[in-house]
């Protein structure tokens, strides 16, 4: 096979008809400015073609499930292998997905518990032994004399099928009745037709008898018969009582509880046989949250209880007011002008959760007269939960859900599994307790359990697989994660590194792996582990192409491909190719300029002092935070640093941001646990500039998000042509009927479903993709229609609106954040996370500064080349220069070295983290020997 991947004439997106030879079975880094064409080369050309060729080789039946990829714009690619992409998109948001299920480690743990787990009685905790038939019969005979019962053989449990042959066999064997899915049928009499696509439970009725003297022999024979047909199981059905399953396998002789044979599905929370029946295996239920109902305990009952009349109570008599006053009178509690926090706890509980059986005398006066009645009070929270369950209105359901939060299931306490499954242990721990440990602790535990020689032999292969997979996760710096952590709560970098570890576990060879910035969210300390993992993937015999900006990865790569020189139309060329040393010496390579030090981000000569005010988080205990108190000085550029999993996002996003958003903006999101957040009066607003999309549909774009499109529509509506035709600004909107093309409803494209090929979008034949109707497009400003303006890049628009300061200043900020290459009308769905974040930054920059705004950014350098980081630093410094405060969660040392104040958390990740290690200027942090950040920052300050 060819030793190289040879690309000829790549023209996808902004690529300039490039020819490129990439060595196979090597670690290759593709780098370049944001928007230069790296992803167009790696993902939209190489991955798309590798995937397309593989899918094309399958049958048309298989293709309809996979979706066909479009052929990229490239003349030819030789030497291409099947491609696997490991990108930044976070793993499933499905609440049933956990780190354990995504990595498949949980499947091995289920197998381990099914094979060598020891069951204990869920009631008395006694170790469960197997039962003999005599013990089972003795247990049944303890029922009162005269008790009627049925002896059933549970022959089918939760299996799909029609079972016609089996039912015929049971009839031939002399059985008269069967119970299917809870319903009785007579064999040979009733017509039995089962849906083969549904799961069924089938029990054969072996005997019906009454407990009396001399029945033992018959009962023993019936139990033996049932066990013969039902794999050592028998069910005893006593009318009006819970059915009992007895097994010759496992049962508690004291409590009469029997266990079925341990199987892996018993430990799966995604299977009805293992899942907690109350929460169906999710681990939590949505319930009305006391903290969301009473967000401010300094208010009185009259105006502090949300969703229960707080907004109307002040205006006069309401039912809610009458309830509160009648209950207060009954218990002799004064509530007028008394803050909720000073009310007796027991009284507040009665208001929130009801008075139980205690009857209250209520008196309600309205225009219709006075009405008296006596009844127990249901309670605010039960009332709202009942209304939520009963309402048929989606609007009301959404209203009640604003006051709900996830609360652990009361049956399983968040463990997701039924009590029988949680009663099986290996050593001292059940499967839930084991998965709640961090990955490195799990590895240590399973390697130190004492096993009998038989168990050791059974478990040998399973433990081998577990050790291998756990080690891969440790190797990519994820030792701090727990296997029970929901997959949806992982950051993009964590999710990507999990998939990377899973791929190494798969052990494939001859594959082309394409990764998108795997170093995101990873502290410099763990970079070596990640690089070793990438090399391991390469050494298995794979080609590894990484889109990356991290210096360490570049130096470790066999080859670097630098795409540039600029972004958008100014990019798309190969500027340099070779090792890091060769790139350094290539003129015209911006990457080479920064690697060699010819260009660099300068350390500020002096750091800003705080304005003397601060915000302080006191006693933070959410997730792994160890009751820490942290002060954020205002008027400074602050970086929160620390290794992955040390608690940075918990402190800044979960506690600080959500508390301020609740108190300043009235947000309903529940903040993380802390005693209090002080100093909120020192700021007037908080803005979280994250990487979530600026819109969910192709209709939203940078022009609409920044607000500049409104001004452009005003401009077009003010032209003479528009005035003559009587067009207002609404005419120039593609979202409402009037000026838009109705054939495509202003989308510019039509979706065509291709069934066994992927859906394709074709330009609308009526408007030719311009979104507007002919009449609207006839209105021109400086010779351009509204559609032409949307099609301009930011850079072109800047020149076009040069003489209109209002519009120019808005577009200028987009250019300043490095987005000169994107189009004003570019659909938001095509913007990367980093681009979306910079559109938000530009929008904030264009607003009037109050000097009292707190900005929060979580890893803003994601997807940014060092030259882009340089530009970002300048913008952030501009925002702070106007008196605002910026808090950034970051690992990028080039950005960290430019900030005024660092808060370093650690020392490790997970339960070994959550402490404040160092606080102060970068110069102060590097002197702290306990700080990993300080250790790596040192060389950046010199």
Q: What is the predicted function of each stretch?
A:
Residues 1-942:
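Conserved phosphate-binding elements of NTP-dependent enzyme cores
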């Amino acid at each position: 096979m060819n030793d190289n991947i040879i690309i000829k004439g790549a023209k996808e997106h902004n690529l300039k008809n490039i020819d490129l030879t990439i060595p196979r079975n090597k670690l290759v880094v593709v780098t370049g400015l944001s928007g230069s064409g790296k992803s167009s080369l790696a993902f939209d050309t190489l991955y798309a073609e590798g995937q397309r060729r593989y899918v094309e080789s399958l049958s048309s039946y298989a293709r309809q499930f996979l979706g066909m990829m479009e052929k990229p714009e490239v003349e030819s690619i030789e030497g291409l292998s099947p491609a696997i992409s490991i990108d930044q998109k976070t793993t499933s948001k499905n609440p049933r997905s956990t780190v354990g299920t995504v990595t498949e480690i949980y499947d091995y743990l289920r197998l381990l518990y099914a094979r060598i787990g020891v069951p204990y009685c869920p009631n008395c905790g006694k170790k469960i032994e197997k039962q003999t038939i005599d013990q089972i019969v003795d247990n049944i005979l303890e029922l009162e004399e005269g008790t009627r019962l049925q002896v059933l053989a549970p022959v089918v449990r939760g299996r799909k099928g029609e079972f016609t042959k089996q039912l015929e066999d049971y009839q031939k064997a002399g059985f008269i009745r069967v119970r299917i899915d809870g319903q009785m049928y007579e064999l040979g009499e009733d017509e039995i037709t089962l849906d083969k696509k549904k799961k069924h439970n089938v029990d054969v009725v072996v005997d019906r008898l009454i407990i009396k003297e001399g029945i033992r022999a018959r009962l023993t024979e019936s139990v033996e018969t049932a066990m013969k047909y039902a794999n050592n199981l028998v069910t005893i059905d006593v009318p009006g009582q819970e059915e009992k399953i007895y097994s010759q396998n496992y049962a508690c002789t004291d409590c009469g509880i029997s266990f079925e044979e341990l199987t892996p599905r018993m430990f799966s929370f995604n299977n009805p046989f293992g899942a907690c029946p109350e929460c169906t295996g999710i681990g939590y239920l949505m319930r009305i949250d006391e903290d969301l109902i009473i967000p401010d305990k300094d208010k009185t009952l009259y105006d502090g209880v949300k969703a229960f009349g707080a907004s109307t109570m002040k205006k006069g008599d309401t039912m809610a007011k009458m309830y509160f006053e009648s209950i207060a009178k009954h218990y002799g509690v004064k509530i007028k002008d008394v803050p909720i926090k000073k009310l007796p706890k027991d009284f507040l509980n009665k208001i929130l959760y009801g008075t139980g059986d205690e009857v209250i005398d209520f008196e309600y006066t309205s225009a219709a007269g006075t009405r008296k009645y006596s009844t127990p009070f249901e309670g605010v929270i039960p009332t709202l939960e009942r209304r939520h369950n009963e309402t048929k209105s989606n609007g009301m359901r959404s209203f009640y859900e604003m006051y709900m939060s996830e609360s652990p299931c009361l049956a399983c306490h968040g463990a997701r599994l039924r009590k029988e499954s949680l009663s099986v242990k290996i050593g001292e721990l059940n499967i839930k307790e084991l998965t709640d440990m961090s990955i490195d602790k799990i590895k240590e535990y399973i390697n130190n359990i004492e096993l009998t020689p038989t168990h050791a032999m059974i478990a040998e292969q399973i433990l081998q697989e577990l050790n291998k997979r756990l080690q891969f996760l440790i190797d990519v710096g994820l030792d701090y994660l727990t296997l029970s952590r929901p997959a949806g709560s992982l950051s993009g970098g964590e999710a990507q590194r999990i998939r990377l570890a899973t791929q190494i576990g798969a052990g494939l060879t001859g594959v082309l792996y394409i990764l998108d910035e795997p170093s995101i969210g990873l502290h410099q300390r763990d970079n070596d582990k990640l690089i070793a993992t990438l090399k391991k993937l390469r050494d298995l015999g794979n080609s590894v192409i990484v889109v990356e900006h991290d210096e360490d990865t570049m130096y470790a790569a066999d080859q670097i491909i630098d795409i540039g020189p600029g972004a958008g139309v100014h990019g798309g060329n190969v500027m340099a190719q070779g090792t890091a040393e060769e790139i350094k010496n290539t003129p015209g390579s911006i990457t080479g300029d920064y690697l060699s030090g010819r260009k660099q981000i300068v350390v500020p000569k002096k750091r800003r002092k705080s304005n003397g005010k601060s915000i302080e988080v006191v006693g933070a205990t959410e997730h792994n935070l160890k009751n820490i108190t942290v002060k954020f000085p205002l008027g400074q550029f602050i970086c929160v640093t620390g290794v992955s999993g040390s608690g940075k996002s918990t402190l800044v996003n979960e506690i600080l941001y959500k508390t301020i958003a609740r108190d300043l903006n009235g947000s309903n999101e529940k903040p993380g646990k802390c005693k209090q957040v002080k100093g909120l009066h020192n700021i007037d607003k908080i803005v979280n500039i994250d990487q979530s999309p600026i819109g969910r549909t192709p209709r939203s774009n940078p022009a609409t998000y920044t607000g500049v499109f409104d001004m452009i529509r005003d401009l077009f509506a003010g032209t003479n042509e528009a005035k003559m035709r009587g067009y207002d600004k609404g005419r120039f909107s593609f979202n409402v009927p009037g000026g838009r093309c109705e054939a495509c409803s202003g989308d510019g494209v039509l979706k065509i479903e291709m069934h066994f090929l992927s859906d394709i979008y074709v330009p609308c034949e009526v408007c030719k993709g311009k979104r507007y109707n002919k009449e609207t497009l006839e209105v021109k400003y400086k010779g351009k229609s509204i559609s032409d303006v949307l099609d301009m890049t930011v850079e072109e628009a800047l020149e076009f609106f040069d003489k209109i300061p209002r519009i120019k200043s808005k577009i200028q900020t987009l250019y300043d954040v490095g987005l000169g290459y994107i189009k004003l009308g570019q659909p938001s769905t095509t913007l990367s996370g980093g681009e979306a974040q910079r559109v938000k930054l530009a929008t904030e920059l264009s607003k009037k500064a109050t000097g009292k705004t707190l900005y929060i950014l979580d890893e803003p350098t994601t997807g940014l080349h060092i030259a882009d980081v340089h530009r970002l630093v300048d913008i952030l410094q501009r925002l702070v220069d106007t008196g605002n405060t910026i808090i950034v969660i970051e690992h990028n040392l080039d950005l960290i070295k430019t900030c005024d104040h660092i808060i370093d958390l650690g020392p490790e990740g997970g339960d070994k983290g959550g402490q404040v290690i160092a606080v102060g200027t970068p110069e102060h942090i590097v002197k702290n020997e306990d700080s990993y950040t300080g250790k790596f920052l040192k060389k950046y300050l010199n």
